[in-house]
C-alpha cells in the first residue's frame, strides 16, 4: 500500500518536472509564428490591394481585402456604409470608452490582465523548467482570461484603420506573445510560464482606468499616475525576463549555466541595477542575462534619473504648495497673483521689501496658477521669512479662501509686460478683480493694466472703491505720459523718473557733474502730515519755512476745500490757499526720517533751532492754537481761478449752464466770464473736452491730416514734435492717445500747443485714429523713421523734440533685438547735422554726417534733440556709443548712463516699483499720475468714464476745467523774471526769492555737462532737488512749477507788454532756425519753456467751449481685438 502511494508521488513529481526544451520551444515558437505569420499575411494583402488598383475590375471577394487594408475600395458605397459606418463605429465607441458599456469593457480587460499577472506571480514560485499539470485549476482560469483577451483582440483588430500599424502596437505584441501559449498548453496538456510576464505592460493603462473611474482629476495626479505606471511596469517586465533567462540558462549551452532565482530576487536585482550598479549579492550568470543588464542599466539611468525624482517632487510639492495659508492674528500679509514668474517676483520683492529697509512686517503670499520652477523656488527660499507660495488661481473661490483674501491687507495683481496679446492679458486680470470683489467686496485691489482703454471696465466692477485704496496702474498711460512731459520740457522725463527709481549700485564719480547727478538720484517723493503749527499759513509761507528751517522741499499738498467733502492734490498752490489741520504734504527728500521734521515742528520749541537734524518730537504740552481758530481758507472772489482741479463737484452749485450730452452730438459747455474783455472774437474761443482738462476739436477725417512728401513747402513745421512709431496692421496698439493728452492739456493756451507729426505705417494709424481724431494740430506722415527722406519731409531739423517709440512687443529669440528699430532710427536721426543759419540766411541747412566727426565739425553743426524709448534697458550701450558719449558713468544700469542723465532715453522698467509705492502710499502715485497725464486724477477719471455732467457756477466751472493748475517749465536765470532776484548765487537764495516774489517753485536744475567747452551739441544733465548751498551757473536752466497766471518774461517796463514780447514758448527759437538748446547757448534770447502767451491775470480765455473727448466704447475694443 505504502509502496503504491510512493510510486504515485514519484510519478506526479516526474510529470511536473518533465518540461523539456522541445515543449518550451513549442510555447515560444507559437508566439513567434503568430506574430511573423500574421505580419507577412498583412503585407501580402496590402501588396495585393495595391496591385488590384491597376485592374479595371477586381475579381474575387472584396470584403476580405478591405479587412486587411489601411484604405478602402470605393465601390458599393451602401455596403461600406453599413459595415463600416454602423458596426465599425459602435466598436470604436466601445474601445474608446465613450459609452458605459465601453467603459465597463475597458475596465474589465484591465482587471483580467492584472488577474493574469497575479496568476503568473503564483506560478513563478515553482522552478521555471517545471511544467504544471493541466489538471491544475489555475490553468483553466488563465485559459478563460486569455479567451476573453482573444475576443478583445479581435475587436481591436476589426476597428483598426491600419492593420499593420495595429499589429506592431505594444498591446498587440503583449497579446500575441501571451495568448497563443495558453492554447498550446491546452493541446500539450501542460503549462509553462514562458513570456507571460509581458502582461505587466498592461499596467501602463492604469492612468486611463483611473480617469474613467474619476479617481484622479488634476493634471498633477494624472502625471503622477503615468510616472508610477511606467516605473512599475518596467520593473515587473525586466524582472520577468531575468527570471526566465537565469532559470532557463543560455539555449546554446542547453541550460548548463542556469541558476535558481526567484521572481522576488529578480525584482531586487532590477531595483538595485536601476538605483546603483548592483550590490553583488544577486547577479546574472547567463550571457543573455548579463547582456540584458548592460542595456537595462543604460536605460535605467534615464528612467531613474528623470522619473523617480519627478515623482518625489510631485508628492512633496503637491502637499507643500496646495495646503492653505494660515493667517496669524496680528500678522499682516498681502496676496499677489497674476503673472507670477521669476522676473516679476524678483522685481516685486526688490521694490516691495525696500520700503521698510530690511524691516519685514508684512508677509507676501503668492498665488500662482502653476507650480514654481526651480529658479523661482530658489528665489522664494531666499525670502522664506516673508514669502509663501500657494498653487491656485484667483478665479476660483476655493483658492481665494485658501490664501485668506478676506484677511489680507490688499490683493496685488501683476501683469505680463512681454505678452503677445495685451488685450487678453488685461481681460484676464480684470476677471481676477471681479472674482476677488465677488468673493470679498471689501478687499483692497491694486492692479497693473497694460492698455488704458481697459481701465473703463474696472470702474464698472461692483464694490470698486477708489477711496478704500483700490488703484489702477496703467503702464501705457504712465509710460507715454513720461515721454510726453519730456517733449514739453527737455529733461523733465528724467527729472520725474529719478524721483521713483532706487539706486543701490555703488558708483564712484570722476567728474563734478556726475556727483551732482548722483546726489539727485537719492531724492524721492515722500509724504508726511504737516504740523498743526502750520494751520492758517499760506502754502508759499509753509514751503519757504520748510526749505529754510527744515531743509525740506514741499511741492504740493492734499487740500480739502470748505465747499465740498473731497480732497484734491494741488501742486504749488497760490497764496489764497491756507493750510488746514492734518494737511498732507508732498516733499522731495532723501529719507522718510527727514520729512518727519515737518510733523514734529513746533513754533514754540523749534523757533530758535538752526540745525534741522535737531528738530524732533518735543515735550511741549501747551501750544498757542490761535491758528486753529483762523479761517481754513481765505479766497477772494476774483481769485477763484487759482484753485486746481477737484474730482467731486456738488450739483448744488449749478447755475445757468447749458449742457447737452450724447455720443453723436458732443456736449458743449460755454463758460462766460464777467471780466472786461478785448478782442473777444470767435477765433479766440478755445474748445475743451467735457472735463475741461484738454483741448478739443471736432472729429477730423484721417485723410485731412495725412501729409504728402511732395508738399513739404506747404507745411513748413517749426518747433513741432516728431514722433516715430513702428507698427503695422497686425501689431498691438501703443495707445498714442496717452501720449497726446498731456501735450493737449488745457493749462496751455491754444497758441502754446505744438504740432505733433507722427511718422509710421498708415495702416497702423488707421487703427489708432479713432482715439486721436478730436485732438487739434495732429499730422501723419506715412513712411518710416528709417528713411531719411521722410524725416526731412517733416522738417525734423526744426523740431523741438523727436520721440522714437519702441516697437510693439514681438516674439523674438533674443531680448536684445526688441529695440532694433528704435536704435537704428536714433542712429539715422543723429547722423543729421544742422548748420547754424548765417547772418544773410533765414533757414538752417541739413546735411547728413557721421556721428563720429571731428571736434571742428561738432562746433559747426548741432544735433536734433531726441528722446528714445528702450524696452530692454541693457541696450543703453548702443545709445551711448551713437551719442558720442564715452560712458563716463560706468555701469550697465540705464539710470546711470549719461544719455539718461541728459534726458535722451527712457525705459518703463521702473514702473514695476509703483506697485509697492501704491500699496504703502497711494498718494504718491496719485501725484505722479497728475503730473505726467496732464493733471487728471483717478477720481476725476471716474467722472470722465461715466460722462457725468458738471453743473456748477461759471466761476467754479473755470476752476473745474483745470486750466489754472501749475505748469512745469524751464526758466533761464538771465532772461526771465528770475533775473530780478537778488541775491541768487545759490539755489537756496533762488528758491526763496522766486517763491516770495512770483510764487514760482524751483525744484531742480538743467545744467551743462561741460561749461568750459560750449558747443552747438552741448549736453545738459538733470540735478534733482539741488542742495541749498548749490552754487548756480549763469547758463543754468531751472525746473519750475509755474502758476498759470504768472508772467515769466523779463520785466523792464510794463508787465503786460513785456509778457507779450518775452513770454513765449519754444516756438520762437525754432522758428528762427534754431532749437531749444541753441537759444540758451548762443545768446539766450528766449527764456521760458513753456510759458503763457497772456500777461495779465484777468484776461485768460474769456470764452471757452468745452467738449467731451470721445469715450472708448466696448464695441471698439471688441472690434480692435
Swiss-Prot record:
Homotetramer; which constitutes the calcium-activated potassium channel. Interact with LRRC52; this interaction changes some channel gating properties, such as shifting gating to more negative potentials at a given pH. The keyword DNA-binding does not apply. Residues 331-473, 718-889 form the RCK N-terminal domain. A motif (Selectivity for potassium) lies at residues 276-279. Keywords: Cell membrane, Cytoplasm, Ion channel, Ion transport, Membrane, Potassium, Potassium channel, Potassium transport, Transmembrane, Transmembrane helix, Transport, Voltage-gated channel. This is Potassium channel subfamily U member 1. Residues 260-282 dip into the membrane without crossing it. Regulated by changes in cytosolic pH; activated by alkalization. In contrast to human KCNU1 is not activated by Ca(2+) or Mg(2+). The auxiliary subunit LRRC52 shifts the activation of KCNU1 to more negative potentials at a given pH. Residues 1-24, 123-137, 187-188, 248-259, 283-290 are extracellular. Residues 836-858, 1052-1076 are annotated as: Disordered. Disruption phenotype: Mutant males are infertile due to abnormal sperm physiology with no overtly abnormal nonreproductive phenotypes detected. Sperm cells from these mutant mice exhibit several functional defects, such as absence of hyperactivated motility, lack of capacitation-associated membrane hyperpolarization and are unable to respond to acrosome reaction induction. Residues 46-101, 159-165, 210-226, 312-1121 are cytoplasmic.
Amino acid at each position: 500500500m505504502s509502496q503504491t502511494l510512493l510510486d504515485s508521488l514519484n510519478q506526479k513529481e516526474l510529470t511536473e518536472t518533465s518540461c523539456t526544451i522541445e515543449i518550451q520551444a513549442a510555447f515560444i515558437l507559437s508566439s513567434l509564428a503568430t506574430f511573423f505569420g500574421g505580419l507577412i499575411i498583412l503585407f501580402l494583402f496590402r501588396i495585393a490591394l495595391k496591385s488590384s488598383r491597376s485592374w479595371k475590375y477586381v475579381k474575387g471577394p472584396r470584403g476580405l481585402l478591405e479587412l486587411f487594408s489601411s484604405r478602402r475600395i470605393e465601390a458599393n458605397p451602401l455596403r461600406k456604409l453599413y459595415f463600416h459606418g454602423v458596426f465599425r463605429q459602435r466598436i470604436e465607441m466601445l474601445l474608446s470608452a465613450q459609452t458605459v458599456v465601453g467603459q465597463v469593457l475597458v475596465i474589465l480587460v484591465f482587471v483580467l490582465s492584472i488577474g493574469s499577472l497575479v496568476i503568473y506571480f503564483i506560478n513563478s514560485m515553482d522552478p521555471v523548467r517545471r511544467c504544471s499539470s493541466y489538471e491544475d485549476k489555475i490553468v483553466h482560469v488563465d485559459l478563460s482570461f486569455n479567451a476573453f483577451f482573444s475576443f478583445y483582440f479581435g475587436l481591436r483588430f476589426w476597428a483598426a484603420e491600419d492593420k499593420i500599424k495595429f499589429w506592431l502596437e505594444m498591446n498587440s505584441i503583449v497579446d500575441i506573445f501571451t495568448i497563443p501559449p495558453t492554447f498550446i498548453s491546452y493541446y500539450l496538456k501542460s503549462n509553462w510560464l514562458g513570456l507571460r510576464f509581458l502582461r505587466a505592460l498592461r499596467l501602463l493603462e492604469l492612468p486611463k482606468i483611473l480617469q474613467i473611474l474619476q479617481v484622479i482629476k488634476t493634471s498633477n495626479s494624472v502625471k503622477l499616475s503615468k510616472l508610477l505606471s511606467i516605473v512599475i511596469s518596467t520593473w515587473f517586465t525586466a524582472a520577468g525576463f531575468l527570471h526566465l533567462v537565469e532559470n532557463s540558462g543560455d539555449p546554446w549551452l542547453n541550460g548548463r549555466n542556469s541558476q535558481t532565482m526567484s521572481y522576488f530576487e529578480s525584482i531586487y536585482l532590477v531595483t538595485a541595477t536601476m538605483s546603483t550598479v548592483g550590490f553583488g549579492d544577486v547577479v546574472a550568470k547567463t550571457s543573455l542575462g548579463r547582456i540584458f543588464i548592460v542595456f537595462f542599466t543604460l536605460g535605467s539611468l534615464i528612467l531613474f534619473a528623470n522619473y523617480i525624482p519627478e515623482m518625489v517632487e510631485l508628492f512633496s510639492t503637491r502637499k507643500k504648495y496646495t495646503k492653505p495659508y494660515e493667517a496669524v492674528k496680528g500678522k499682516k500679509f498681502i496676496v499677489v497673483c497674476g503673472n507670477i514668474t521669476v522676473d516679476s517676483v524678483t522685481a516685486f520683492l526688490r521694490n516691495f521689501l525696500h520700503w521698510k529697509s530690511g524691516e519685514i512686517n508684512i508677509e507676501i503670499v503668492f498665488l500662482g496658477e502653476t507650480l514654481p520652477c526651480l529658479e523661482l523656488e530658489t528665489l522664494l527660499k531666499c525670502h522664506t521669512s516673508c514669502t509663501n507660495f500657494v498653487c491656485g488661481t484667483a478665479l476660483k473661490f476655493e483658492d481665494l479662501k485658501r490664501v485668506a483674501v478676506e484677511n489680507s491687507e490688499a490683493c496685488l495683481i501683476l501683469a505680463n509686460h512681454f505678452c503677445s496679446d495685451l488685450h487678453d492679458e488685461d481681460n484676464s486680470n480684470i476677471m481676477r478683480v471681479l472674482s476677488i470683489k465677488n468673493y470679498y467686496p471689501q478687499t483692497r485691489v491694486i492692479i497693473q493694466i497694460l492698455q488704458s482703454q481697459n481701465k473703463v471696465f474696472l470702474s464698472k466692477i461692483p464694490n470698486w472703491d477708489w477711496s478704500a485704496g483700490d488703484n489702477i496702474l496703467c503702464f501705457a498711460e504712465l509710460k507715454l505720459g513720461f515721454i510726453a512731459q519730456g517733449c514739453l520740457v527737455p529733461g523733465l522725463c528724467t527729472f520725474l523718473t529719478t524721483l521713483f527709481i532706487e539706486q543701490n549700485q555703488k558708483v564712484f564719480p570722476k567728474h563734478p557733474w556726475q556727483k551732482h547727478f548722483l546726489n539727485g538720484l537719492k531724492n524721492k517723493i515722500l509724504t508726511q502730515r504737516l504740523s498743526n503749527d502750520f494751520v492758517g499759513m499760506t502754502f508759499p509761507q509753509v514751503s519757504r519755512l520748510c526749505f529754510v528751517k527744515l531743509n525740506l522741499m514741499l511741492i504740493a499738498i492734499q487740500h480739502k476745500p470748505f465747499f465740498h467733502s473731497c480732497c484734491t492734490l494741488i501742486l504749488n498752490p497760490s497764496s489764497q490757499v491756507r493750510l488746514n489741520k492734518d494737511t498732507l504734504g508732498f516733499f522731495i527728500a532723501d529719507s522718510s526720517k527727514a520729512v518727519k521734521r515737518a510733523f514734529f515742528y513746533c513754533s514754540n520749541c523749534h523757533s530758535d533751532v538752526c540745525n534741522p537734524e535737531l528738530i524732533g518730537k518735543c515735550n511741549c504740552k501747551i501750544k498757542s492754537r490761535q491758528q486753529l481758530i483762523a479761517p481754513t481758507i481765505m479766497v477772494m472772489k476774483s481769485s477763484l481761478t487759482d484753485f486746481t482741479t477737484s474730482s467731486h463737484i456738488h450739483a448744488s452749485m449749478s447755475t445757468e449752464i447749458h449742457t447737452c450730452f450724447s455720443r453723436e452730438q458732443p456736449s458743449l459747455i460755454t463758460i462766460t466770464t464777467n471780466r472786461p474783455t478785448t478782442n473777444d472774437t470767435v477765433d479766440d474761443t478755445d474748445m475743451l473736452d467735457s472735463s475741461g482738462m484738454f483741448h478739443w476739436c471736432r472729429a477730423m477725417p484721417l485723410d485731412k491730416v495725412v501729409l504728402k512728401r511732395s508738399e513739404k513747402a506747404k507745411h513748413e513745421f517749426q518747433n513741432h514734435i516728431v514722433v516715430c512709431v513702428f507698427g503695422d496692421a497686425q501689431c498691438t496698439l501703443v495707445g498714442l492717445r496717452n501720449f497726446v493728452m498731456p501735450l493737449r492739456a488745457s493749462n496751455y493756451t491754444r497758441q502754446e500747443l505744438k504740432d505733433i507729426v507722427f511718422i509710421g505705417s498708415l495702416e497702423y494709424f488707421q487703427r489708432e485714429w479713432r482715439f486721436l481724431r478730436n485732438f487739434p494740430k495732429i499730422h501723419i506722415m506715412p513712411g518710416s523713421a528709417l528713411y531719411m527722406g521722410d524725416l526731412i519731409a517733416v522738417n525734423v531739423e526744426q523740431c523741438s523734440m523727436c520721440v522714437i517709440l519702441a516697437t510693439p512687443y514681438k516674439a523674438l529669440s533674443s531680448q536684445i533685438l526688441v529695440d532694433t528699430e528704435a536704435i537704428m532710427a536714433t542712429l539715422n536721426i543723429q547722423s543729421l547735422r544742422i548748420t547754424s543759419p548765417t547772418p544773410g540766411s533765414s533757414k538752417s541747412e541739413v546735411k547728413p554726417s557721421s556721428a563720429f566727426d571731428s571736434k571742428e565739425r561738432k562746433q559747426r553743426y548741432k544735433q536734433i534733440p531726441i528722446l528714445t524709448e528702450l524696452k530692454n534697458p541693457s541696450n543703453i550701450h548702443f545709445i551711448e556709443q551713437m551719442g558720442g558719449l564715452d560712458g563716463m558713468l560706468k555701469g550697465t544700469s540705464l539710470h546711470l548712463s549719461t544719455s539718461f542723465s541728459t534726458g535722451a532715453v527712457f525705459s518703463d522698467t521702473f514702473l514695476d516699483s509703483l506697485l509697492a509705492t501704491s500699496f504703502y502710499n497711494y498718494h504718491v502715485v496719485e501725484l505722479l499720475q497728475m503730473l505726467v497725464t496732464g493733471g487728471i486724477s483717478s477720481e476725476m477719471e471716474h467722472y470722465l468714464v461715466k460722462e457725468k455732467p458738471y453743473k456748477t457756477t461759471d466761476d467754479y466751472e473755470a476752476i473745474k476745467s483745470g486750466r489754472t493748475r501749475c505748469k512745469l517749465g524751464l526758466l533761464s536765470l538771465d532772461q526771465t523774471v528770475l533775473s530780478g532776484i537778488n541775491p541768487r548765487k545759490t539755489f537756496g537764495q533762488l528758491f526763496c526769492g522766486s517763491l516770495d516774489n512770483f510764487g514760482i517753485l524751483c525744484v531742480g536744475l538743467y545744467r551743462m555737462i561741460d561749461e568750459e567747452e560750449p558747443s552747438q551739441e552741448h549736453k545738459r544733465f538733470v540735478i534733482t532737488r539741488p542742495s541749498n548751498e548749490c552754487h548756480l551757473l549763469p547758463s543754468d536752466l531751472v525746473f519750475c512749477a509755474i502758476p498759470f497766471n504768472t508772467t515769466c518774461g523779463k520785466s523792464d517796463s510794463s508787465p503786460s507788454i513785456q509778457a507779450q514780447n518775452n513770454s513765449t514758448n519754444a516756438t520762437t527759437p525754432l522758428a528762427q532756425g534754431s532749437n531749444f538748446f541753441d537759444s540758451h547757448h548762443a545768446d539766450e534770447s528766449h527764456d521760458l519753456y513753456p510759458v503763457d502767451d497772456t500777461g495779465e491775470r484777468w484776461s485768460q480765455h474769456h470764452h471757452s467751449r468745452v467738449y467731451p473727448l470721445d469715450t472708448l466704447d466696448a464695441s471698439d475694443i471688441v472690434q480692435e481685438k
